[in-house]
Amino acid sequence: SLSDKDKAAVKLLWSKISKSSDAIGNDALSRMIVVYPQTKTYFAHWPDLSPGSPHVKAHGKTVMGGIALAVSKIDDLRAGLLDLSEQHAYKLRVDPANFKILSHCILVVISMMFPKEFTPEAHVSLDKFLSGVSLALSERYR
C-alpha cells in the first residue's frame, strides 16, 4: 500500500504534470496500441488507431481524467474507483492485465516528458500508485 511519503510524492508530481495530462494520455495510449497490438481489440470500432488520431487523443484524455480522479481518491482507491471498475469489468470487459500495460506506458511517457521531475523517488511512488490504481480497477472482476 501507499505510505504517506508515497502519497505526497504522487500529489507533488501530479501538481507538476497535470497541465500536460492530455498529451501524456495521448502518447501513453498511442504507445500501448503500437507496442502491445493485442490491445487494439478494445478499440476495433475506432476508424483510426494511429498515434494521435482523434479517438486516441480523446480516450487518452479520458484515461488521464481517471488518473486525476485516482489522485483525488488516493486515500481509498478501491472505493474511489469503484464505478470505473464496474464499467471496465461489466460494460467494457477489459482484461485487467491491460491496466498494468497502460500503467507502464504512462510511466514511460512521464519519464520522457518530465525527466527532471521524474526522480527515482517519484518513479517508485508513481509506480506503486499506478499498481494500486490497477488493483482498484480490477476490484469488480472478482
Swiss-Prot record:
N-terminal signal peptide: none
Provide a GO biological process annotation: hydrogen peroxide catabolic process
Molecular function (GO) terms for this protein are: haptoglobin binding; heme binding; iron ion binding; organic acid binding; oxygen binding; oxygen carrier activity; peroxidase activity
Q: Which Gene3D superfamilies match?
A: Globins
Keyword terms: Acetylation, Heme, Iron, Metal-binding, Oxygen transport, Transport
Q: Where does heme b bind?
A: 88
Residues bearing PTM N-acetylserine = 1
Instruction: Tell me the tissue specificity.
Output: Red blood cells.
Which residues does the annotation say bind O2?
A: 59
Question: What's the further remark here?
Answer: This fish has three hemoglobins: Hb1, Hb2 and HbC accounting for about 70%, 5% and 25% of the total, respectively. Hb1 has high oxygen affinity and displays strong Bohr, Root and phosphate effects.
Q: Which family does it belong to?
A: Belongs to the globin family.
PANTHER family to which the protein is assigned, alphabetical: HEMOGLOBIN FAMILY MEMBER, HEMOGLOBIN SUBUNIT ZETA
Q: How does it assemble?
A: Hb1 is a heterotetramer of two alpha-1 chains and two beta-1 chains. Hb2 is a heterotetramer of two alpha-2 chains and two beta-1 chains. HbC is a heterotetramer of two alpha-1 chains and two beta-2 chains.
What name has this protein been given in UniProt?
Hemoglobin subunit alpha 1
| Species classification | Eukaryota, Metazoa, Chordata, Craniata, Vertebrata
